[in-house]
A protein has these predicted regions:
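Glycine-rich phosphate/pyrophosphate-binding loop and the adjoining helix
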Residues: 144-194
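A short, structured loop/turn motif at beta-sheet edges
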Residues: 29-31, 127-130, 161
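N-terminal beta1-alpha1-beta2 submodule of the flavodoxin-like/Rossmannoid cofactor-binding fold
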Residues: 1-90, 95-103, 188-194
């Protein structure tokens, strides 16, 4: 089995979302599992300079920026396709996702690769039979409240890609009671049944 772990916190050291994702990975992985790791703060590029064709630019028409963007996009799509389980850790920044996580979703959303359009115009996700775990942290935002624009968006994106089995581990409102939030998150991880 392949487990794809994606960390998006801008903090390398002292990140609660990264630490919880690591604990989750230790809980679910088996010795024979292959781990694919991606730190979105290491080489993420942002979608820019595209025309109305979106992510469908012929290779001969790509400039250097496009080539770098498509190279990373192809790698991200490959990582998603190859994985059986996906762990995404993300803090809520200003009520939404980290910019690098949004960039990841933009680069991973590829027609014919992660989704397609049906004849009736509706979308269909192509990444079936996968499970995702979201590890969401926040300072003051209550998870799934009307101020949380990360969790529902990320669930929607994964569903858009065809990933319908999504479980959330949360350590929210840490600024109000850090110890309680961490204890609850650890309990959520401990309850996971494989």
């Amino acid at each position: 089995m392949k487990i794809y772990q994606i960390d998006s916190s801008a903090r390398k050291e002292g990140s609660t979302s990264r630490a919880l994702a690591k604990k989750l990975l230790e809980k679910i992985k088996k010795p024979e599992d292959e781990i694919i790791y991606r730190d979105l703060n290491e080489e993420m590029v942002f979608v820019s300079g595209l025309t109305e064709s979106g992510m469908n630019i012929d290779e001969k028409d790509q400039n250097e920026n496009h080539k770098k963007m498509f190279e990373l996009s192809n790698q991200l799509v490959k990582e998603l396709k190859e994985s059986d389980i996906i762990i995404i850790s993300a803090p809520i920044y200003n009520y939404g996702p980290p910019a690098t996580l949004k960039a990841w979703s933009d680069l991973a959303a590829r027609i014919g690769e992660t989704f397609k359009f049906k004849p009736n115009g509706r979308r269909e996700g192509l990444l079936k039979n996968k499970k995702a775990y979201l590890v969401i942290t926040s300072g003051g935002t209550k998870l799934n409240s009307n101020e949380d624009f990360l969790t529902p968006w990320l669930k929607f994106i994964l569903n858009f890609f065809g990933i319908e089995k999504v479980e959330t581990i949360s350590a929210d409102q840490m600024a109000l009671d850090y110890e309680k939030s961490i204890k609850e998150a650890h309990a959520q991880i401990d309850k996971i049944k494989l």
